[in-house]
Design a protein with these regions (language model features):
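Active-site-proximal loop/helix segment associated with metal-binding centers of metalloenzymes
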Residues: 130-138
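Core catalytic region of metal-dependent phosphoesterases/phosphodiesterases
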Residues: 8, 13-23, 28-122
Length: 138
């Protein structure tokens, strides 16, 4: 009996990339503005060629509609990520808290959506990227 393993999504890093950063489980929320400020400072200063956001970027994301609400936290987060995506490639993977992030979010921010899991080929190595919540079996 042979077991068939479905193919995983793959992303091949451009040859010029030398540094990538991985962030996960920031759980951004309006009640914790210091976390958003820390993310802003990080995004303005990182020398990374690309940034990977591996799930639970938000404590909760109820849908892309909130981006349009005046002075909304979601709108501020989206604007921050859009600015960062103009500087370097940004990638986003759903977590169990922000699985409703959708096409409108990615369109407006310029952040590319990754499947979970995705294999990243970078500097002649293969890296398995996953949020990991699907691995919690108990």
């Amino acid at each position: 009996m042979q077991l068939a393993v479905p193919p995983m999504a793959e992303l091949v890093a451009p040859a010029g990339w030398r540094t990538v950063d991985f962030l996960a489980d920031l759980h951004l929320e309006p009640a914790q503005p210091a976390t958003l400020q820390a993310l802003r400072q990080y995004l303005e200063s990182t020398p990374a060629d690309a940034v990977f956001l591996l799930g639970d970027l938000f404590e909760v994301w109820v849908g892309d509609d909130a981006i349009d609400e005046p002075d909304s936290f979601e709108g501020a987060c989206s604007a921050l990520l859009a600015g960062a995506a103009r500087q370097r490639p940004m990638y986003f993977m759903h977590g169990n808290r922000d699985f409703l992030v959708g096409a409108e979010f990615t369109r407006r921010t310029g952040v590319a959506l990754l499947a979970d899991p995705t294999v990243l080929q970078f500097l002649d190595q293969r890296w398995l990227l996953s949020h990991g919540d699907a691995l919690c079996l108990n």
